[in-house]
Amino acid sequence: MLGLLGGVGGVGLLTLAGCGGADRPGAAARTPGSAPPGPATTATTGTTATTTAISAADCAPFPTETGGPFPADGTNGPNVLNQAGVVRTDLRESFAGLRGTATGSPLAVRLRVLDLDAGCTPRRGIAVYAWHCDGDGRYSLYSAGATDQNWCRGVQVTDGDGTVAFTTVFPGAYPGRYPHLHFEVYASAASAAGGPKLLTSQLAFPE
């Protein structure tokens, strides 16, 4: 369980499934070397999504993992979290005055935040910041040829079902890494602009 500040104790982010584009398998997993994946709560293929109930017995905290060297959260250079337009569903385009589109196959991602201290009930109003490389393995704001872009980055706030959804592109693999997506969890959209992180972790998509 997470030790969270401000009375938001016991928030767990579960593995969600499926993240599937038109030509991608619909499965998500923890990064190599971490604990085995927990039960999938959401399956997404193309534009169709199904949700499976999670029992309290199956509910488990998500492991903390590195945010990597390209977070653009102000800890290593640029910070998109204080820019207008960062709260968005579609991550494929750059925003805040930048123009550009990420390369890669379409990908739909759904994440669900559950309260472990309340019988694994959904948490409304939690902010999730997600980022990843494009289909060519480039990180916006950091990689050569992409320093003037901020695609594949954005924040969503959980709905009444504890869910956030992103439309993006399938991240490319690069030496030593499976395709993967990083995320940070904050108590609210306002706290994402400088407040404490409740969780930093990532999902891997073995091809």
Language model features with spans:
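Beta-strand-dominated extracellular/periplasmic modules and repeats
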Residues: 50-207
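N-terminal export signals
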Residues: 1-20
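C-terminal segment of N-terminal export signals and the immediately downstream linker at the start
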Residues: 15-79
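A generic signature of intrinsically disordered, low-complexity regions enriched in glycine/proline
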Residues: 10-13, 27, 119
